[in-house]
Amino acid sequence: MIRQSTLKNFAIKRCFQHIAYRNTPAMRSVALAQRFYSSSSRYYSASPLPASKRPEPAPSFNVDPLEQPAEPSKLAKKLRAEPDMDTSFVGLTGGQIFNEMMSRQNVDTVFGYPGGAILPVYDAIHNSDKFNFVLPKHEQGAGHMAEGYARASGKPGVVLVTSGPGATNVVTPMADAFADGIPMVVFTGQVPTSAIGTDAFQEADVVGISRSCTKWNVMVKSVEELPLRINEAFEIATSGRPGPVLVDLPKDVTAAILRNPIPTKTTLPSNALNQLTSRAQDEFVMQSINKAADLINLAKKPVLYVGAGILNHADGPRLLKELSDRAQIPVTTTLQGLGSFDQEDPKSLDMLGMHGCATANLAVQNADLIIAVGARFDDRVTGNISKFAPEARRAAAEGRGGIIHFEVSPKNINKVVQTQIAVEGDATTNLGKMMSKIFPVKERSEWFAQINKWKKEYPYAYMEETPGSKIKPQTVIKKLSKVANDTGRHVIVTTGVGQHQMWAAQHWTWRNPHTFITSGGLGTMGYGLPAAIGAQVAKPESLVIDIDGDASFNMTLTELSSAVQAGTPVKILILNNEEQGMVTQWQSLFYEHRYSHTHQLNPDFIKLAEAMGLKGLRVKKQEELDAKLKEFVSTKGPVLLEVEVDKKVPVLPMVAGGSGLDEFINFDPEVERQQTELRHKRTGGKH
């Protein structure tokens, strides 16, 4: 009994032990530990090819650890001493092995830009029929394309670039993917191993540089270990909370020829699970699930707060709706969670946070129980932490509510907000396990009466157009949402970063998962266009629209010709107010209208589009808008539509820094008129 208890406790300890990704001797443990934190069925996982030598998982995983194993047979001893060897790579260069490994990982698209240090790989994939290759104009574009592809397809985005500046140019996309939990595998060229540390031409310590913005990174030291490192990269990128990984490929490694067979287990994708530890984890998690169900059944004013984690599993949105319907719980989502819950459902509260719906913010502040699913309580959602969820904190102190956190990444639990119950592991899987324990609720009349009152009192509002006035950007979004959805096609929207991003989140009607692709955690301007190209590659039959602002679009506008070259019929909408709108909004509110370097000179976007092979459209007047929007979405190839919109239009509601979620600035026409007069006075009529 003592031995059994000890083994069990050891398994539980191992289950939740944090293993540093940078600890090279623990590389095999990293991949294993990642699998402990999530289910064996996850939406982002690449489908492995079946092993031909023996079943997976190995039979030994099902053996009781206390049971004395039978004496191995002579054949078993021989197999143990002589592991299965893969001869299929013998005689191939590292570049050719890379090509084959992409096939084994079911990669169908690679985004990249060639260069000297990575030429052995590019030579090997010349005319390759194993995957589609998309060439950007800049390596940053390749990274954001891979992000858009991953978000739309559920598969990891793959990037292949050269050393030095080629590698450093993908640091921003990796940091972006790391912040938003997007699976991405980046392969970078490197100078030959003999030249490392000599300041050779285009040498950069990309492993060191990318350490803080990847889940894991590695430099491949020999051609023999190349297949293993590629397999580890895909496994780690798609396990637990998805994210970017980097594999650095020295030129002599990719040019080298493999002379001897290597173990088969290093050349085939692995899907083995440690069943002993999984059983120990399941027991611990079920205790948390039971406690969570008890609190949900007790709650009077619960709210579901849902992030992008619910989208990591194909069944996530379905189970979310089932829980909401079963217990009559209203649902609010983060920016990245938009689309996971149908906004036309009366239980939808829309988005919460700094520029979220006032109803959602008020509901969170007044809820006695907050059920966080696949969300991480970032600062744009919580506002001032000391003022966050006061009613839930009061209910927690009285033992009748609080905060429940369904989260796959242990580091996100209790990082920002103290939770009463943490359910660690794949959020969707654990929701499924909890469902039968939730009591059906017919109605929550008092709670929804209050919510519906807030909805009527605080709708998204803005100063609408008057005859002859400039077009309001919010109007463009609302009209485009209807026109696009009326086509009957599957619609995907990407955005850049700025006011246009928030207006898209607020005024588009989000009904389906994986239809809103944007940069949330890092807030990367220029994200929209390349992400749209990647999404279109992943979903060629979908209507893909990039809603962009002029300042954000300027960051990566060179990718217009990439859209043409890739044959992607993306639709690019530019809301042109000739300013860095989100920054000028803050300058108006908090810096007495001192617009320091926030107005840029734009190119002629229509001539630019036409020069790069796209159709260009422009709208200046209100009466032109409807017809141009219809022409925009019905155009067969790539098209750019520029709409000249009103300037100095604020995104509201807004929760200012240091404020609680219920202390928002809401639209007031009289206040806006006063602000306009004050702005004219302070800027001498210039703005």
Curated annotation (Swiss-Prot):
Composition bias type Low complexity, residue spans: 43-52
GO BP, one annotated term: branched-chain amino acid biosynthetic process
Pfam families the record matches: TPP_enzyme_C (PF02775), TPP_enzyme_M (PF00205), TPP_enzyme_N (PF02776)
Pathway: Amino-acid biosynthesis; L-isoleucine biosynthesis; L-isoleucine from 2-oxobutanoate: step 1/4; Amino-acid biosynthesis; L-valine biosynthesis; L-valine from pyruvate: step 1/4
Stretches for region Disordered: 43-68
Catalysis: reaction(s): 2 pyruvate + H(+) = (2S)-2-acetolactate + CO2; 2-oxobutanoate + pyruvate + H(+) = (S)-2-ethyl-2-hydroxy-3-oxobutanoate + CO2
Residues that, per the record, bind thiamine diphosphate: E139
Activity dependence on pH, as recorded: Optimum pH is 7-7.5.
Amino-acid positions noted as binding Mg(2+) in the UniProt annotation, renumbered to this chain: D550, N577, E579
Cofactor: how and how many bound: Binds 1 Mg(2+) ion per subunit.
Regulation of this protein's activity per its record: The regulatory subunit ILV6 stimulates enzymatic activity seven- to tenfold and confers sensitivity to inhibition by valine and activation by ATP.
Transit peptide: 1-90
Binding residues annotated for FAD, in chain numbering: 241, 355-376, 407-426
Family: Belongs to the TPP enzyme family.
Record's miscellaneous remark: Contains 1 molecule of FAD per monomer. The role of this cofactor is not clear considering that the reaction does not involve redox chemistry.
Name the record gives this protein: Acetolactate synthase catalytic subunit, mitochondrial
Taxonomic classification: Eukaryota, Fungi, Dikarya, Ascomycota, Saccharomycotina
